[in-house]
């Protein structure tokens, strides 16, 4: 079953309680991507073959991404050992942050050519920032990513800053994210994952968003 990812509200929608555990990540200007293991779903394999499972990637609306085979290939052995984990992140490349359309055009191809696949392999990365698990707090989910999800040239862990104690501290980190070329910042509370738009996840792109 394909899960819907958690979506963010603007920071201005509801005040943040900095007495709780608060986390900040850079906001990526990428393509939302959920990756999970699906058992017995590959009709292209010989029925006598033992392994009819596959790793599948899809958008926030459930549309399958067809042109990231290089990422799915690297993740399949890991998913075979972790079949119930669902990764949440974005297809992104920080070196292409000023050419967002390039990533979009590559990942949206439903019938990619050999050249399209080569371009995607060179340019498209999966940046993982959460796992879809409605039983764990964000701190637990973040720790799982750091300790278990593989990292390489095309699978990246999104950095997480924890222990945010005040709005001034949050703004300072947000300013640093902007200076590093990110679209903005994502603020997370230490709550369980919600497969809907949730105040557990807030976004702001500039200081006006935070102060509105």
Where are these regions (language model features)?
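Short, basic, glycine/proline-bearing loop/turn elements
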Residues: 1, 150-162
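Phosphate/adenylate-binding "loop-and-lid" substructures adjacent to NTP/NAD/dNTP-binding pockets
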Residues: 1-14
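Glycine-centered structural positions embedded in regular secondary structure
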Residues: 5, 87-91, 184
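Flexible, active-site-adjacent loop/turn segments at secondary-structure boundaries
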Residues: 5, 26, 199-202
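Generic structural "secondary-structure junction" signal
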Residues: 9, 94, 133-134, 203-206
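Short capping/connector residues at structural and topological boundaries
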Residues: 12, 33, 206-209
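Covalent nucleotidyltransferase
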Residues: 14-153
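Amphipathic alpha-helical
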Residues: 160-211
């Amino acid at each position: 079953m394909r899960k819907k990812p958690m979506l963010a509200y603007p920071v201005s929608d509801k005040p943040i309680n900095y007495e709780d555990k608060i986390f900040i990540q850079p906001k990526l200007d990428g393509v939302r991507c959920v990756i999970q293991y699906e058992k017995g779903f590959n009709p292209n394999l010989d029925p006598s073959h033992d392994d009819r499972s596959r790793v599948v990637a899809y958008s926030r609306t459930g549309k399958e991404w067809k042109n990231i085979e290089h990422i799915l290939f690297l993740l399949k052995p890991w998913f075979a050992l972790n079949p119930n984990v669902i990764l949440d992140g974005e297809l992104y490349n920080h070196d292409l942050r000023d050419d967002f359309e390039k990533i979009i055009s590559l990942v949206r191809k439903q019938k990619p050519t050999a050249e399209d696949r080569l371009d995607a392999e060179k340019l498209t990365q999966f940046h993982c920032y959460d796992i879809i698990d409605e039983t764990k707090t964000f701190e637990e989910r973040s720790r799982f990513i750091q300790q278990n999800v593989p990292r390489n040239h095309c699978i990246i862990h999104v950095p997480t800053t924890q222990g945010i104690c005040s709005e001034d501290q949050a703004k300072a980190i947000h300013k640093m994210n902007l200076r590093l070329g990110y679209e903005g910042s994502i603020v997370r509370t230490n709550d369980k994952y919600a497969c809907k738009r949730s105040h557990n996840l807030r976004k702001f792109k500039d200081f006006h968003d935070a102060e509105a």
